[in-house]
Regions:
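A short coil-to-beta-strand element that immediately follows conserved catalytic motifs
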Residues: 69-79
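A structural signal for short, well-ordered beta-strand segments
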Residues: 17, 77, 94-96
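NUDIX/MutT-family hydrolases
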Residues: 104-135
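Acidic, metal-coordinating catalytic segment for phosphate/diphosphate chemistry
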Residues: 1-16
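Active-site-adjacent beta-strand/loop module that shapes the phosphate/pyrophosphate-binding cleft
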Residues: 81-102, 135
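Conserved Nudix-box catalytic region and its N-terminal flanking loop in Nudix hydrolases
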Residues: 26-66
Length: 140
């Protein structure tokens, strides 16, 4: 059965890590190109679509490591949302803390950078929910 046949309750889930450095009060974002699900996407938080074989948090740690070379701990779920650009796409945002590693560009990113949480919106070309933006302000 094709997932498009369901009229509700089926989403393409994406896990995203707000990788935060409490010492510098900065978060890590990555630049992507050619995202097949959100054509407008440029900068994003590291993460990806989970496989069925892993716990969500374990999968997110693996994806962040592949994309940034950083080992992180998962602190908590921050927020979940769908997008006006594609309502079938559900993102779950987690607060993550760097445990070890030196950041470097990895899988699917062409660039990574640390930014002030209140500057994230300057980079993103997709919508960021007001509740997420309000939360990011608390990190500064």
């Amino acid at each position: 059965m094709e997932w498009q046949e369901f009229d509700r309750g089926v989403f393409l889930v994406n896990l995203l890590g707000i990788v935060y450095n409490p010492e510098t009060k900065m978060i890590l974002i990555g630049k992507r190109e050619n995202n097949p699900y959100l054509k407008e996407l440029s900068w994003s938080f590291p993460g990806g679509r989970p496989a069925y074989k892993n716990e969500l948090e374990d999968y997110l740690k693996i994806e962040i490591k592949k994309k940034t070379n950083l080992d992180v701990s998962i602190e908590k779920i921050i927020f979940a949302k769908t997008y006006p650009e594609n309502r079938e796409f559900l993102s779950i945002y987690y607060l993550c803390k760097v445990e070890s590693g030196e950041e470097k560009v990895g899988e699917k990113f062409t660039e990574i950078k640390w930014v002030k949480p209140t500057n994230v919106q300057k980079y993103f070309t997709t919508s960021l929910h007001k509740n997420l933006l309000d939360y990011l302000k608390t990190l500064e």
